[in-house]
Swiss-Prot record:
Biological role stated in the UniProt entry: Catalyzes the attachment of proline to tRNA(Pro) in a two-step reaction: proline is first activated by ATP to form Pro-AMP and then transferred to the acceptor end of tRNA(Pro). As ProRS can inadvertently accommodate and process non-cognate amino acids such as alanine and cysteine, to avoid such errors it has two additional distinct editing activities against alanine. One activity is designated as 'pretransfer' editing and involves the tRNA(Pro)-independent hydrolysis of activated Ala-AMP.
GO molecular function, one term: proline-tRNA ligase activity
Recorded name of the encoding gene: proS
Catalytic activity: tRNA(Pro) + L-proline + ATP = L-prolyl-tRNA(Pro) + AMP + diphosphate
Record-given protein name: Proline--tRNA ligase
Localization per record: Cytoplasm
Organism: Syntrophotalea carbinolica (strain DSM 2380 / NBRC 103641 / GraBd1)
Database matches in InterPro entries: aa-tRNA-synt_IIb (IPR002314), aa-tRNA-synth_II (IPR006195), aa-tRNA-synth_II/BPL/LPL (IPR045864), Anticodon-bd (IPR004154), Anticodon-bd_dom_sf (IPR036621), Pro-tRNA-ligase_IIa (IPR002316), Pro-tRNA-synth_IIa_bac-type (IPR004500), Pro-tRNA-Synthase_IIa_type1 (IPR023717)
């Protein structure tokens, strides 16, 4: 491809609404252009990288025995009503009616559609196992779309679905997909971790997220340096540490704490460590229940853990008026003593004695508070967010916190959807059996964005070879010099004949401008053809990663570069 024939509109300045580096660079490098909030045009240069990821995905899905199909993006509401998700999914589901007032949605995932397809086409266990996938545009009406392709409303996704006669078969399918995902992200040239994760709106028994490690990542990852344990912060377990039974030594007493609402303010006023305080959160479930949750003062609530314990979809902090009604005081002074609410507590509270809590009265706290003597807890559970320095729940090592970008997610669904939609097959005894399912997603555009987050420098993108839009950029220093242009044209043709994907920069621009664009767009290898080098029958090779430069004999350059491309792509 010739630059003069190619739509590659680079930008010198970063658009003001771009926040993270991948968004900035994808706009500046002419990969995407914004159409509306969270909705983007994929320009030729960006689409080439996306197609590279899609091809790797297809190869590994096919290798794992999955078959590609394509399902409609528009889904009738009846299927979502059957599964129960029409009411529970939330406002991210874009719903609409057609001219006949029939209800539809734009499918953010396709569990219902694929289950409906299979229940109407698969009759016998002899047709199993089955694994079907698609690569398709999807839509989620995110309340705050941001970060370009990281959190858009419209996005490209690979979603796969496995069907088995029993749980053992489903476990085999899950492991195949897990390993396929590892190969996909390794082939994309990414540094990543597979972590235990919450199943969220998809549901099911267990899941793993594939997280690209990047400082800009929205997600926190907990991992152990001594074993393989790794989990999303929402799922990360907190190990119970052995401790002596707390012994109450102080009397319960009320103390004035004027204007002290926060943990930090109370600790400073009373001259105690935050670890000696217990905070009382008044929360509400989506079912309307109001309850109290106790945490040690230096710990934070993990909403997902609490939702799992309560069996609800969402919890929120109670509004100020509700807090005032149930405690008699403003937020910041709530406490469990004489509180007429259901009380749950994190395990860490179980090991405390003589602690400080709110007194359910303005500007007042209790000191010398103790369990059982002063109040009771209905249930203790792991309710707090894991922190760096916590003990690993698997091996006793020390946990670390990383930042990551989720690019893939695999789920064991069990019979959640097959039971809801009546997807059964006849087993070898002629009995109806509900299908065991798994689902497996990859954000294709997000994978490209995550690769840029992980591979860039102050000058621009540094594409990994396997997903680079082009392998090689041939830069003509001065296309007005016939000898230089002819040599570049010949080199360009040689590379194409060898199967190398090459962009020829034949623009009549200043060399410095071309070199800046070359750094910005991040093509892995650059061959510079100029009069000075041609005097020695040589061209300059520069690797984008690291910037190493060396001269190559003109006659051998194409073959040498081809070998570098083949090695870097692992083929």
């Amino acid at each position: 491809m010739r630059y003069t024939d190619y739509l590659l509109p680079t930008l010198k300045e970063t658009p003001s609404d771009a926040e993270v580096i991948s968004h900035k660079l994808m706009l500046r490098a002419g990969m995407i252009r914004k159409l509306a909030a969270g909705i983007y045009n994929y320009l030729p240069f960006g689409l080439r990288s996306i197609r590279k990821v899609e091809q790797i995905v297809r190869e590994e899905m096919d290798r794992a025995g999955a078959m590609e199909l394509l399902m409609p993006m528009v889904v009738p509401s009846e299927l979502w009503e059957e599964s129960g998700r029409w009411e529970h999914y939330g406002k991210e589901l874009l719903r609409f009616t057609d001219r006949k007032d029939a209800s539809f949605c734009l499918g953010p995932t396709h569990e219902e559609v694929i289950t409906d397809l299979v229940r109407n086409t698969v009759r016998s266990y002899r047709q199993l196992p089955l694994n079907l996938y698609q690569i398709q545009g999807k839509f989620r009406d995110e309340i705050r779309p941001r970060f370009g392709l990281m959190r858009g409303r419209e996005f490209i996704m690979k979603d796969a679905y496995s069907f088995d006669i029993d749980e053992a078969g489903a476990d085999v399918a899950y492991e195949k997909m897990y390993q396929a995902y590892r190969r996909i992200f390794e082939r994309c040239g990414l540094k990543f971790r597979a972590v235990e994760a919450d199943t969220g709106n998809i549901g099911g028994s267990s899941s793993h997220e594939f997280m690209v490690l990047a400082a800009s990542g929205e997600d926190a990852i907990v991992s152990c340096g001594q074993c393989e344990y790794a989990a999303n912060i929402e799922k990360a377990e907190v190990a119970l540490t052995a401790s002596d039974t707390p012994v109450a030594a102080a009397e319960l007493a009320r103390v004035d704490t004027p204007g002290c609402k926060s943990i930090e303010e109370v600790a400073a006023f009373l001259k105690v460590d935050k670890e000696r305080l217990v905070k009382t959160l008044i929360v509400q479930t989506d079912a309307g229940e109001t309850l109290a949750v106790l945490l040690r003062g230096n710990h934070e609530l993990n909403d997902i853990k609490l939702c799992r314990l309560l069996g609800c979809n969402e919890i929120t902090l109670a509004p100020d008026d509700v807090v005032g009604k149930v405690t008699g005081a403003a937020p910041g002074f709530a406490g469990p003593v004489d509180l007429s609410l259901r009380v749950l507590a994190d395990f860490a509270v179980q090991g405390m004695a003589d602690f400080v809590t709110g007194a359910n009265a303005a500007d007042t706290h209790y000191v010398g508070v103790n369990l059982e003597r002063d109040f009771t807890v209905e249930q203790f559970a792991d309710l707090r967010a894991a922190e760096a320095g916590d003990i690993c729940p698997r091996c006793g090592g020390v946990l670390e916190i990383w930042r990551g970008i989720e690019v893939g997610h695999v789920f064991k669904l069990g019979t959640k959807y097959s039971a809801a939609l009546g997807a059964t097959v006849l087993d070898d005894q002629g009995q109806d059996r509900e299908l065991f399912m798994g689902c497996y997603g990859i954000g294709v555009g997000r994978t490209v964005a995550a690769a840029i987050e992980q591979n860039h420098d102050e000058n621009g993108i540094v594409f990994p070879m396997p997903i680079a839009p082009f392998h090689v950029l041939v830069t003509v220093v001065n296309p007005r010099q016939e000898e230089v242009l002819a040599a570049a044209e010949n080199l360009y043709a040689e590379l194409q004949a060898l199967g190398v994907e090459v962009l020829l920069d034949d623009r009549d621009e200043r060399p410095g401008s071309k070199f800046k664009d070359a750094d910005l767009i991040g093509i892995p290898l650059r061959l510079t053809v100029g009069a000075r080098g041609l005097k020695e029958n040589a061209v300059e090779l520069q690797e984008r990663a690291g910037g190493e430069r060396r001269m190559l004999p003109l006659a051998e350059a194409a073959a040498l570069v081809r070998d570098m491309v083949v090695e870097a792509c692992g083929r």
